[in-house]
Amino acid sequence: MAEAKITEFKKSDETHKISDKRGNGKLRREVWVDTKGKVVRYNLAYINQQLFQGDNGRVIGYDNAHGTHHRHYFGGVSPVDFVSFDDIEERFEADWLALGSMK
């Protein structure tokens, strides 16, 4: 029987607790890359069930599940134009920081 060829692997799987002073909740980052190091899947999320109980507490998120790049925001989902993974990370960070300034 032929051995299965690995075409992608999880490069990053991180969860960071946000202090109550900085807004509470968790930042979640998952990134999968192919054998050449190109990002093929990702999931970035700010989770805080005190702010939003729907969508498993995901307040803000970006991912490319189900074959499309999209943004989650308080339960709503909208498509995003994919330029690069770095661009997606910058958008996610900007959204999260903007949310903190609204409080």
Task: Give the residues covered by each predicted segment.
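The feature represents the first ordered module of a protein
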Residues: 2-70
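Short, compact, well-ordered microdomains
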Residues: 75-103
